Each structure stands twice: as structure tokens, then as C-alpha cells.
């Protein structure tokens, strides 16, 4: 537009507003995310768990790790400098004068709004005498006073002030840019262009490009996409993977390849040390040629993993590489579990026979290998080796004991304290207390299972093809809590038995002679007799008396006989009346019982409706909580003697058919189980009615021998037939018929009107 000019900030006042906002947008989020956490809290936490986790490798590495004292200090200095700059700019903004102020003639004349004309004239006289230029006053102030007086007394000036905010009428409004004028100065144009070019043409493309290059190489779980492709190929190729094959495929991940991961290193000494470890292990097949499983980096990772599972001592130059490899194993095994599940889903969706799904054994071997990698144990080793001070030498004393045959952690926990102490007599008191402390920290998880069909009238009735929802409630306790409860129960059971034995001894001591004289009596079995119904019986008179009465006065006898007959008739009538009344009372009772049964049914139905409504509300609340809450994945640290990183307790939960060796529901990775957790497992019901027996598995990804198994029985019924007639449909049809009738009536009425008009 012609004549348009941009006004930049010459004074720098408006630029301070922009600069303050910009600095605040940087400093506030940076303080939240970059302010160093309290190191003392971490030290206190490590001190509190030292009794249990003091022998773990990750605990010792955490203590040996040098504390980063310089980096937190630098962060604090930078953030504090940013806050100082922000506060300085805010103070500067608060002290700057406003360039645009609304014109108010009352303020110029030092009057309150709404002053009268007389007050205005009086104040004008006083101020004009004071600021008149002829009397040595301020000329500018005098002009402002005259302008304000005219705005309040002159009709036209007052109207302009009320409408436009100025007694002189509408004025030109100017808008400025909150940037200093030196930025657009011709002298500084080259410098400004260089800064803009560096920021938007070099720095920004480099940042976006590096982020994009990284994002296309990694998946959402920070696993290389090339690794996922390798796992998918070999899992599909080998349908049933044993443990050796699984370790071989795991070691082929691109995370261990220096070409794709800079954190992975390859040293010249590996050509000497790795063959030595291969000879010591002695169970590695080097004849197959399956790249990348036979590449040098994959072979190195496999050897380091096998040496870790065998708890072998390796050279110090390889320890760092082994720790790096072990830290990657849990995430890689979780990715392999996901790949197996995806292939199973693809096999179910496709009806091609050539597409073969991985077996359930392959999936369970992946989960088993995760436990082995965390605990540093081979496949068939005893779970008791997870405990401290229990090694191969003294394990035989525990597992091959004559009285107690202890094979699992649960067997050791189920013993009494005295038996446990005698079994572990080869340990010193301090070591025994440490073993008990570690054993008490192990998790004990219970499962409560409930199967139902959501969004159905009869949620407990499972029909063919319905979507079954299995609600599993997990409750985590420690082994210490479990054997504390068992000890209290045992003590409560022993007390009454001891009291009973002492009472029996007292009785024997006092009255032993009574027991000698009196033998044990056998009580006859009492049989319950059925109550007999009493019939009305008439007592007959003796014959001699009857004959005497008849001979003495026959008339009286005849009258008496007549009276007796009348009494018999009256008795029969009374009996019939009693029977009728009994029938009436029975019918009334039956009616009352029917009413009571109806009431009971109504009450039962109302209770069922309330229970269903409560379950529905609970499910809705559960879903809302799952959507809104973001639970932390920090649950409980795992006791692992040879794992180099602190790991949290996580679990896999799934349903399988052990008989058919098929996976029913996909594994759910439970990462937030602290105390209790509710998990929903969904799967389609079988296609045929009948009784089905499944198994719910809860497998740990860190501990060996602590898996939980619970049976799940399903009774599948035929699907309900689709109703052909429904009252709602009848009303809809009637409404359509009424509408058609009304339309037909309107058409006939219109035709009659047209005929009448034509006749006219």
C-alpha cells in the first residue's frame, strides 16, 4: 500500500515485552526438565536397600559409579542465570512508561469525574493563573489546561472526546513492531541476514534431519527396525525354536553391530579372547552359514551371553561389552515376544496352510530366556541358585536332603523356621540372615479370575462366537508376609492342641480308675422315627354293660341309640366342615407361598440388576482410570546377582490351551504391579458349544521358579436365535401403516377437490 510505513521500536520499550515472554518460554520448561534431582534421596534409597541388594552387581556398580558433580552444577548455574535475566527483564518492563495513554480532561484539571460546570470554571481559573506564560508559567501545561477546559465546556469538543477520545476529533492510530530499529538498519543488514540464514537454513534442517533419520531407524520401543526384521524372518523360518536356536537369533540383533549402533564396540583383542571362550563353552556350532547370525558381532554377543548364563569368569576387557549386551536383552526379548504374537495373529487371519504360526513353546522359551538372562542361570539349573551364598557345592545338601527335598523357592518358604535353619546349617548366622532377608523380598503373586461377556444381557452366559473377557486381579505380596501368616496360623493351631493334651493328661491322672472299671460303651445308632398320623378312634363299651342296659330299659336304649346316631351324623358333619376349612387354609397358604415366591424372585431379580449395574459402573470407572492415569513403571527392584543394571519386576499374563499347545489370548506385559492390578484379557469364544479347559499363565520376566498357573473352565452354549417378532417392530410397522393410510386419505381428498373444481 502506498504511504504505508512500519514503525520500529526506537526507544526499546516494547521490545522488552517480547524479550521477556521469549525468555520465560525457555526458562520455565527448562527448569522443570533439566533441574538436577536430589542426589541425597538416591543415596538414602540405596542405603535402605543395602541389606537385601548389597551383593547384586547393579548395586555395586551404582556405588562405584562416580557421582556427576560438575554437570549438575553447570546446569544449576545456567538455569539460575536464565532466571536472573528473566527477572531483570520483568523489572525493566514494570518500570517502563506507557507510550499510549488515554486522554482524560478531568485528570488534567485535577477534578473528579462528574464535576459541575461551576467547579470546572473555578479550577480552570486557578490553574490558568498558575501556569499562564505571561506570569512565568509552563506554556505546554497551559495549553493542555485550555484544551481540557474546552473539552468539558464546549459542546463540539466534548462530543469529540466522548466518541473518539480526543477533543480534536479522530486521530491517526499508529502500530509499531516490537523489534529494535537497529535490526532493520541498513548498516546491520548483512549481519541480520547471516543470523537468519544460519538459524533457518543450517541449524533447523540439521536438527530436523537428525531427528527424522533416527525416528525412521527405530521403533516406538527404541528397537532398531532392522532388528525387528531379522527376528521376524528367523522366527517365521524356525517355527519351533529351542533354547539354543533362540539364543542364536537373539544375538543377531543389530544393536550389537557397530555399523548400526555406535555404542557397540569391536576390539582387536576380540579375535584372541572370543575363540578362547568358545573352547571353554564347547557347545557352539560354527559350521552353519546364516548371516547375520554367523557374523563376528553376533558370534561375540552369543558367546558373552552363554558365558553369563554359565556364570563364567571372563577377561576384564570383555566385561564392559558383556554388560552392554545384557542391558539390551530384556527389551530385545520383549520385541521377540511381540514378533511371535504378530505372526500368530497373521496365521489366524490367513487361511493359507503354507503360513505356519510359531508354537507356544517358542513363546514360552522367550520368556524363560528373559529370566535366565536376568538371573545368570542356565535353563535346567535350580531356582535356589538365585539366592546368595547358595552355590553348586552346597546346593546338593539342600536338594538331596534325606528329610527335606527342596527343589524350588516355594518349598524352602513352606518349611518352618527351625527346619529351615537346620537345613541351612552350613551357613553362618550372618549369611543365614542375609538369605532370609533376600528370600523374604521375593514376590508372591496371587490371581483372582472371573470370565464374562461384556455388553450382554446375561454376562455370565458364554455363547459361540462371543467376545470373552477374563478379568484377572493380581495381588502382590512378599514371601516374608506369606511365611509370617503361616507361622501365626501354625502357632494358633498348636496352642489348642497343647491345651487339649494337658487337659487329657490331668483327667488321666485324676480319674484313671474310672476308666479301668468302665469300658468303652458303644452307643447305638439313633434312628429317626417318622411321626404317625393320629386317627380319631371311638372307645367301645364292654358287652356285658351294653346287654344290661338293653334289658333294663329298652326304650331308653333305643333313644340312646338314636342320639348316638345323631351324634355320629353331627360328628361326620363337623369332620367335613373341618376338612373344608383345612382345604381353604391350605389354598390360602399356597396363595401366600406363591406370593412370597414371587416377591423373592422379584427381590432376587432386583439384586441381580443392582449387581450388574454396579459391575457396569466399575468397568466404566476402570476404563476411565486406564485412560486417564499414567502409572509409573517403577515397581520393585529385582534381586539379581549378576545383572549389571537395576531392573524392575514385570510380568507376562496370557491364556493358553496346554492340551492343544495353542495361544488363546495375546500376552499382556504387566509393568505397573506394585500392590494390586486388574487386567482384562479378551479372546473370541470357541466356534462349537461344549466345555473347554484353558490355563491362565503369569510368568515373571526376572525370576525363575515364581510363575503362577491357574485353570480356567469355560462352558460355551449355543448362540441365542435372533427374534423374528418384537413388539417394537410391530409398533414401527403400525406407524408406517398409519402414515400410508393418512397419505392415501389425503390423496383421495385432493382428487375429490379436483373433480369438484372441474365440474364447476
Swiss-Prot record:
Keywords: Chaperone, Coiled coil, Endoplasmic reticulum, Membrane, Phosphoprotein, Protein transport, Repeat, Transmembrane, Transmembrane helix, Transport. Expressed in kidney (at protein level). Residues 518-536 have a biased composition (Basic residues). Pfam families: DnaJ, Sec63. SMART domains: DnaJ (SM00271), Sec63 (SM00973). The chain crosses the membrane at residues 15-35, 70-90, 189-209. Residues 603-635 form a coiled coil. PANTHER family: SEC63 DOMAIN-CONTAINING, TRANSLOCATION PROTEIN SEC63 HOMOLOG. The gene is Sec63. The modification Phosphothreonine is found at residue 537. This is Translocation protein SEC63 homolog. Residues 1-14, 91-188 are lumenal. It comes from the Eukaryota. Mediates cotranslational and post-translational transport of certain precursor polypeptides across endoplasmic reticulum (ER). Proposed to play an auxiliary role in recognition of precursors with short and apolar signal peptides. May cooperate with SEC62 and HSPA5/BiP to facilitate targeting of small presecretory proteins into the SEC61 channel-forming translocon complex, triggering channel opening for polypeptide translocation to the ER lumen. Required for efficient PKD1/Polycystin-1 biogenesis and trafficking to the plasma membrane of the primary cilia. The keyword ATP-binding does not apply. Gene3D superfamilies: 5' to 3' exonuclease, C-terminal subdomain (1.10.150.20), C2 domain (2.60.40.150), DnaJ domain (1.10.287.110), Sec63 N-terminal domain-like domain (1.10.3380.10). Residues 104-165 form the J domain. It is found in: Endoplasmic reticulum membrane. Residues 492-617, 720-760 are annotated as: Disordered. It is a multi-pass membrane protein. It comes from Mus musculus. Residues 543-552 have a biased composition (Low complexity). Residues 582-608 have a biased composition (Basic and acidic residues).
Amino acid at each position: 500500500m502506498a504511504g504505508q510505513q512500519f514503525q520500529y521500536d526506537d526507544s526499546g520499550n516494547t521490545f522488552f515485552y517480547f524479550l521477556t515472554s521469549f525468555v520465560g518460554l525457555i526458562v520455565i520448561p527448562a527448569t522443570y526438565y533439566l533441574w538436577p534431582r536430589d542426589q541425597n534421596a538416591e543415596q538414602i534409597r540405596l542405603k535402605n536397600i543395602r541389606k537385601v541388594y548389597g551383593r547384586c552387581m547393579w548395586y555395586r556398580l551404582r556405588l562405584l559409579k562416580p557421582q556427576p558433580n560438575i554437570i549438575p552444577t553447570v546446569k544449576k548455574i545456567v538455569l539460575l542465570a536464565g532466571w536472573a535475566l528473566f527477572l531483570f527483564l520483568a523489572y525493566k518492563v514494570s518500570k517502563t512508561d506507557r507510550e499510549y495513554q488515554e486522554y482524560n480532561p478531568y485528570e488534567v484539571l485535577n477534578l473528579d469525574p462528574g464535576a459541575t460546570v461551576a467547579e470546572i470554571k473555578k479550577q480552570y481559573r486557578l490553574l490558568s493563573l498558575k501556569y499562564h506564560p505571561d506570569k512565568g508559567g509552563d506554556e505546554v501545561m497551559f495549553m493542555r489546561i485550555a484544551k481540557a477546559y474546552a473539552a468539558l465546556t464546549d459542546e463540539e469538543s466534548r462530543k469529540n472526546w466522548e466518541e473518539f477520545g480526543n477533543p480534536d476529533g479522530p486521530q491517526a492510530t499508529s502500530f509499531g513492531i516490537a523489534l529494535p530499529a537497529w535490526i532493520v538498519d541498513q548498516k546491520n543488514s548483512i549481519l541480520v541476514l547471516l543470523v537468519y540464514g544460519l538459524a533457518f537454513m543450517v541449524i533447523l534442517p540439521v536438527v530436523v534431519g537428525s531427528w527424522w533419520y533416527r525416528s525412521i531407524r527405530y521403533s516406538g520401543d527404541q528397537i532398531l527396525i532392522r532388528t525387528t526384521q531379522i527376528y521376524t524372518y528367523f522366527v517365521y523360518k524356525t517355527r519351533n525354536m529351542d533354547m539354543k536356536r533362540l539364543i542364536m537369533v537373539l544375538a543377531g540383533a543389530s544393536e550389537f553391530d557397530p555399523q548400526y549402533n555406535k555404542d557397540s564396540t569391536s576390539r582387536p583383542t576380540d579375535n584372541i579372547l572370543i575363540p578362547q571362550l568358545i573352547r571353554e563353552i564347547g557347545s557352539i556350532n560354527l559350521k552353519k552359514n546364516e548371516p547375520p547370525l554367523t557374523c563376528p558381532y553376533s558370534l561375540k554377543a552369543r558367546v558373552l551371553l552363554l558365558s553369563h548364563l554359565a556364570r563364567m569368569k571372563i577377561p576384564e576387557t570383555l566385561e564392559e561389552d558383556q554388560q552392554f549386551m545384557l542391558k539390551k536383552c530384556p527389551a530385545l526379548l520383549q520385541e521377540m515376544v511381540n514378533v511371535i504374537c504378530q505372526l500368530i495373529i497373521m496365521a489366524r487371519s490367513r487361511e493359507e496352510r503354507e503360513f505356519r504360526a510359531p508354537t507356544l513353546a517358542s513363546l514360552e522359551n522367550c520368556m524363560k530366556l528373559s529370566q535366565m538372562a536376568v538371573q545368570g542361570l542356565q535353563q535346567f539349573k535350580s531356582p535356589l541358585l538365585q539366592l546368595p551364598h547358595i552355590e553348586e557345592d552346597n546346593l546338593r545338601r539342600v536338594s538331596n536332603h534325606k528329610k527335606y527335598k527342596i527343589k524350588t523357592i516355594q518349598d524352602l518358604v513352606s518349611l518352618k523356621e527351625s527346619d529351615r535353619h537346620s537345613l541351612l546349617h552350613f551357613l553362618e548366622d550372618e549369611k543365614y540372615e542375609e538369605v532370609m532377608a533376600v528370600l523374604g523380598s521375593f514376590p508372591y503373586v496371587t490371581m483372582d479370575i472371573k470370565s464374562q461377556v461384556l455388553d450382554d444381557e446375561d454376562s455370565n452366559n458364554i455363547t459361540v462366537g462371543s467376545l470373552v473377557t477374563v478379568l484377572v486381579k493380581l495381588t502382590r505380596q512378599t514371601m516374608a508376609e506369606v511365611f509370617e501368616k503361616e507361622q501365626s496360623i501354625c502357632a494358633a493351631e498348636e496352642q489348642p492342641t497343647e491345651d487339649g493334651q494337658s487337659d487329657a493328661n490331668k483327667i488321666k491322672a485324676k480319674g484313671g480308675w474310672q476308666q479301668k472299671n468302665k469300658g468303652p460303651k458303644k452307643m447305638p445308632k439313633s434312628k429317626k422315627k417318622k411321626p404317625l398320623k393320629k386317627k380319631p378312634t371311638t372307645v367301645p363299651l364292654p358287652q356285658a354293660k351294653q346287654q344290661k342296659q338293653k334289658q333294663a330299659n329298652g326304650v331308653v336304649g333305643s333313644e340312646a341309640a338314636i342320639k348316638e346316631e345323631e351324634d355320629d351324623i353331627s360328628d361326620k358333619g363337623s369332620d367335613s366342615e373341618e376338612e373344608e376349612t383345612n382345604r381353604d387354609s391350605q389354598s390360602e397358604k399356597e396363595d401366600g407361598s406363591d406370593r412370597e415366591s414371587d416377591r423373592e424372585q422379584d427381590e432376587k431379580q432386583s439384586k441381580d440388576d443392582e449387581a450388574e449395574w454396579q459391575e457396569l459402573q466399575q468397568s466404566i470407572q476402570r476404563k476411565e482410570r486406564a485412560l486417564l492415569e499414567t502409572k509409573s513403571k517403577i515397581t520393585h527392584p529385582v534381586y539379581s546377582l549378576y545383572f549389571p543394571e537395576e531392573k524392575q519386576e514385570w510380568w507376562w499374563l496370557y491364556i493358553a490351551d496346554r492340551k492343544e499347545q495353542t495361544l488363546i489370548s495375546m500376552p499382556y506385559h504387566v509393568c505397573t504391579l506394585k500392590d494390586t492390578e486388574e487386567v482384562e484379557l479378551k479372546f473370541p469364544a470357541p466356534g462349537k458349544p461344549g466345555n473347554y479347559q484353558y490355563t491362565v499363565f503369569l510368568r515373571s520376566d526376572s525370576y525363575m521358579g515364581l510363575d503362577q498357573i491357574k485353570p480356567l473352565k469355560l462352558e460355551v452354549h449355543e448362540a441365542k436365535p435372533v427374534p423374528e417378532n418384537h413388539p417394537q417392530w410391530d409398533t414401527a410397522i403400525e406407524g408406517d401403516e398409519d402414515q400410508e393410510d393418512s397419505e392415501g386419505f389425503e390423496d383421495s381428498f385432493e382428487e375429490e377437490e379436483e373433480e369438484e373444481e372441474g365440474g364447476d
